[in-house]
């Protein structure tokens, strides 16, 4: 029996949904949208564990508290089949280091100049996820 992925109808639907998802991501201002399998980086849990154990997470206690599910998405959602990753450059248009040459001018932290990037990105992710779920007839977490 053929694998489901070899079925031309399934491949076409997958490819159509991938194009739709990437288009929605770009429309919401994301620079990158990639899709992979949940086990595509088998060393991820160990790397994250070592990072946290070395104290590199600083004061972000939530990283230690959630390292199991962050290291393996199947811990969070056992039925997961794909992982979607987004990237967005939320930096300023101008190089903030240019102000270093002008010590008589005040410099405001890049992160304090605009809306909190957590809120911006989260809102845009929710928009992409809502549209994708409606198109695909699927659940999104």
Which role fits each region the language model picked out?
Residues 1-141:
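Auxiliary alpha/beta "docking" domains used to position bulky ligands
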